[in-house]
Amino acid sequence: MVFDRLAGIYDATGVEFFRPVARRLLDLVDPRPGVDLLDVGCGRGAVLFPAAERVGPGGTVVGIDIAEPMVRATAAEAAERGLGTVSVRLGDGADPAFPAGSFDVVTASMSAALFPDLPAVAARYARLLRPDGRIGLTGPVPPPSLREWALGPLRVGAVVDAIAPEAVAATHPRIAALLGAHPFGAPGAVADALRAAGFVEVRELHEDLELRAPSAEALVGWTWSNGLRVYWELVEPDRRAAVAAELVRDLTAHAAGGPITATYPVAYVTGRLRPAGGTP
């Protein structure tokens, strides 16, 4: 699994991405002191650790991730920080194994919004929440297709264009399905799934996050340190250097002697579970 290989470099290349997204998400869901929070797809703790500060000693924060090396590394960091209210465990983010009504807040940053069968996933999260509980998800603003996906001058589509579709269809059918239209769902699909699961006050906010790197090569290298690596690994090894060089040229030309930057459009979707009795 790609994410098993990422634990050592995930969110650690010097390009700030997961942490600023996490801070903004927490501002939106606003977990209060004393609440119990579940973070789905916790990775290296971008949401987990600042959430622990917000809920304080009277609350708890539980992180789950499907990648065992990620879980081990994040659990070790929680122990090093002396965070006794934080626990990290292996778990399937699409179907977390907790009793109903275990949490006041569920967050899933750059994870659940990308799951297939979002309506079913949203319904499972609703079951985990107590009445009036809050949910907050983040994901990419859905592009029409992966080939059209661009983070400003950083064209993810250039990597996707170098993938041989027939080879992917034979060996990675789930990823092959992403090569069609709306790989991350149609616009509004996440918000619609939350409403169908019984959430109210559902809001979707799109914001651009600027990515900065010391060099074009460093920014291209960042794409190997997160989920974008999935697409790189589908490119034949002898083609990767040429694709990377193309991306470096694009970024350098865009910078025109200034800072090397890209722009990641992030979708934040939040909601509140309808209180007991069904009255919003």
Curated annotation (Swiss-Prot):
InterPro entries associated with the record: Methyltransf_25 (IPR041698), SAM-dependent_MTases_sf (IPR029063)
Give the EC number(s) under which this enzyme is classified.
Answer: 2.1.1.351
Entry's Pfam families? Methyltransf_25
What keywords tag this UniProt record? Antibiotic biosynthesis, Methyltransferase, S-adenosyl-L-methionine, Transferase
Q: Name one GO molecular function term.
A: methyltransferase activity
Null allele phenotype: Mutant loses the capability to produce nocamycin I and nocamycin II. Mutant produces a new nocamycin intermediate, 21-demethyl-nocamycin I, which was designated as nocamycin E.
Known catalysed reaction(s)?
Answer: nocamycin E + S-adenosyl-L-methionine = nocamycin I + S-adenosyl-L-homocysteine
GO terms (BP aspect):
antibiotic biosynthetic process; methylation
Pathway(s) where this gene product acts = Antibiotic biosynthesis
State the top-level EC class. Answer: transferase
Summary of the function given for this chain in its UniProt record: Involved in the biosynthesis of nocamycin I and nocamycin II. Catalyzes the methylation of nocamycin E to yield nocamycin I.
Question: What protein family is recorded?
Answer: Belongs to the methyltransferase superfamily.
Listed name of the protein: Nocamycin O-methyltransferase
What species does this protein belong to? Answer: Saccharothrix syringae (Nocardiopsis syringae)
What's the name of its gene? ncmP
